[in-house]
A protein has these predicted regions:
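N-terminal secretory signal peptides
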Residues: 1-46, 50
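Alpha-helical structural elements
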Residues: 4, 30, 58, 67, ...
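Generic detector of leucine side chains in alpha-helical contexts
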Residues: 5-8, 25, 37, 62, ...
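Generic structural hydrophobic/aromatic packing signal, biased to beta-strands
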Residues: 8, 20, 35-37, 60-63, ...
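Alpha-helix initiation/capping motif
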Residues: 21, 54, 108-109
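A short, surface-exposed interaction/processing loop segment used at functional sites
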Residues: 53, 57-84
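C-terminal partner/receptor-binding element of secreted or periplasmic proteins
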Residues: 73-124
């Protein structure tokens, strides 16, 4: 539901709007933070993906892509990829550094991540 979408500020130059589905957020026993990412383009198109970020190795993984608003299709490229700080995939770097795995700090719990996303502010 739209009420569960938490806005994610990516950059002042981003042309799309980014959201994390708060109900999808989880931290697994393997330490991977899993979440549903919703990207809305300026023209109204929406992309939905189920992803994970592994703090220990600074990597991300795309598990599945949403299709037709009701089904998931498994990603064809489900290999772990190093998180790069570039304009194309900046949302992953923001989630990694500012919300899920802040450098030099204790890893936040799920409640803290959700609170920070709700506030629209990083945890520092």
């Amino acid at each position: 539901a739209s009420a569960d979408l938490l806005p994610l500020y990516v950059s002042s130059t981003a042309t799309a709007s980014f959201f994390i589905d708060g109900k999808s957020l989880s931290i697994a026993d393997d330490g991977v933070v899993r979440y549903t990412l919703v990207i809305r383009g300026s023209g109204g198109a929406e992309n939905v993906s189920y992803e994970g970020i592994r703090c220990e190795t600074a990597e991300r993984k795309l598990y599945a892509i949403g299709r037709n608003g009701s089904e998931w299709v498994r990603s064809r490229n489900d290999a772990w990829q190093v998180i790069a700080e570039n304009a194309l995939n900046r949302q992953h770097a923001v989630l990694f550094k500012e919300y899920f795995c802040p450098p030099g700090e204790v890893r936040p719990g799920l409640d803290q991540i959700v609170r920070s996303l709700r506030r629209g502010a990083v945890m520092r």
